[in-house]
């Protein structure tokens, strides 16, 4: 497996998975009707950097990194991760998160914050906690889950060393 900066052709290959994930409305607060061009801009162009993890020619997952906020708070990074369904349970999200922390340090960030981890996404919450992220806040009924209705979201944070 190797992690590299994303190309447009990588995103084109991952697009069906990306679209399925946002249309499921279980983990990401993206418009489920987002088109390719808007999704590419949102995930790959607007962030500071974007990466994919590949095995052979298969894309297993992706993440972006960007400042969580501008100006005096720009030392805190924010990331988003997606893993293809057929790659789940293989440690891909963990590898991506560890890679993103290293990249964050290289880019001069001192912390990482996830602004809206859907509380019902137990696998992600548990993984982030194993990787020393703390829940620093709960946003009540912040996410309109397709099957469960309004559920809480967590703000999760980690100081980087």
Ranges and model annotations:
Residues 81-82, 139, 145-161:
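Terminal substrate-recognition subdomain of acyl/acetyltransferases
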Residues 1-14:
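A short beta-loop-alpha structural element at the N-terminal edge
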Residues 58-61, 123, 150:
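Glycine-rich acetyl-CoA-binding "A-motif" of GNAT/NAT acetyltransferases
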Residues 31-86, 97-98, 103, 159-160:
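Acetyl-CoA-dependent GNAT
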Residues 15-41:
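Conserved GNAT-fold acetyl-CoA-binding loop/helix
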Residues 129-139:
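Conserved acetyl-CoA-binding loop of GNAT-fold acetyltransferases
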Residues 114-124, 143:
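Conserved beta-strand-loop-alpha-helix junction that forms the acyl-donor binding cleft
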Residues 104-117:
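Conserved GNAT acetyl-CoA-binding A-motif
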């Amino acid at each position: 497996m190797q992690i590299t900066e994303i190309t447009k052709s990588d995103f084109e290959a991952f697009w069906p998975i990306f679209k399925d994930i946002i249309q499921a409305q279980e983990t990401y607060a993206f418009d489920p009707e987002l088109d390719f061009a808007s999704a590419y801009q949102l995930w790959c162009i607007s962030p500071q950097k974007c990466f994919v993890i590949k095995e052979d020619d298969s894309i297993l997952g992706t993440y972006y990194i960007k400042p969580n906020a501008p100006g005096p708070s720009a030392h805190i990074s924010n990331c988003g991760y997606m893993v293809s369904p057929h790659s789940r349970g293989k440690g891909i999200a963990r590898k991506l998160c560890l890679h993103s922390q290293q990249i964050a340090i290289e880019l001069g960030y001192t912390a990482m914050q996830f602004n809206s981890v859907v509380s019902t996404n137990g696998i992600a919450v548990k993984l982030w906690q194993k990787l020393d992220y703390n829940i620093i806040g709960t946003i009540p009924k912040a996410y309109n889950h397709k099957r469960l209705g309004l559920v809480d979201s967590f703000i999760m944070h980690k100081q980087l060393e």
